Amino acid sequence: MSADSTTKFGFVCVQNAGRSQMSTAFAERERERRDLEDSVEILTGGTHPADHVHEEVVEVMGEEGFDLSERTPREVSTDELESCDIVATMGCSTLELDAETVDVRDWALDDPDGQEMEQVREIRDDIEQRVVDLFDEFNPDD
């Protein structure tokens, strides 16, 4: 990422109620930690959004200092996703995006909905590392 350009990350899953919400929260934190608010945009959404973020996700993210209780899953369009530089899907997407303009990465993560809390924590920790790695890839000077 150069100082004069904006990079846009998209995090998407079907319901936008678990994995993509965790990814977004970690990306927002990483963007702030690295002082990249002016150069990194973050988009999140689902192809068939749920009514609320999964309770398990709210709880395990609360353990890490994130309050996702007021977040609302939202629908995301193909046009929105094609405006991203990178789109991370969570392993459940059948999106067909223009591969010439968007780098789509399938993170193939288990769905936390209905899982035991320890499994949800493992998914959370995996997501956190993937997000940090993504920022390292695009901002290696930190």
Swiss-Prot record:
Summary of the knockout phenotype: Deletion of the arsADRC operon results in increased sensitivity to arsenite and antimonite but not arsenate.
Coiled-coil ranges from the UniProt annotation: none
Functional description taken from the UniProt entry: Reduces arsenate [As(V)] to arsenite [As(III)].
Gene behind this protein: arsC
Protein name: Putative arsenate reductase
A Pfam family matched in the record: LMWPc
Additional note from the record: As expression is low no effect on arsenate resistance has been found.
Matches recorded under SUPFAM superfamilies: Phosphotyrosine protein phosphatases I
Keywords: Arsenical resistance, Oxidoreductase, Plasmid
Induction: Weakly induced by arsenite, antimonite and arsenate.
Similarity-based family: Belongs to the low molecular weight phosphotyrosine protein phosphatase family.
EC numbers: 1.20.4.-
GO biological-process terms attached to the record: response to arsenic-containing substance
Single GO MF annotation: oxidoreductase activity
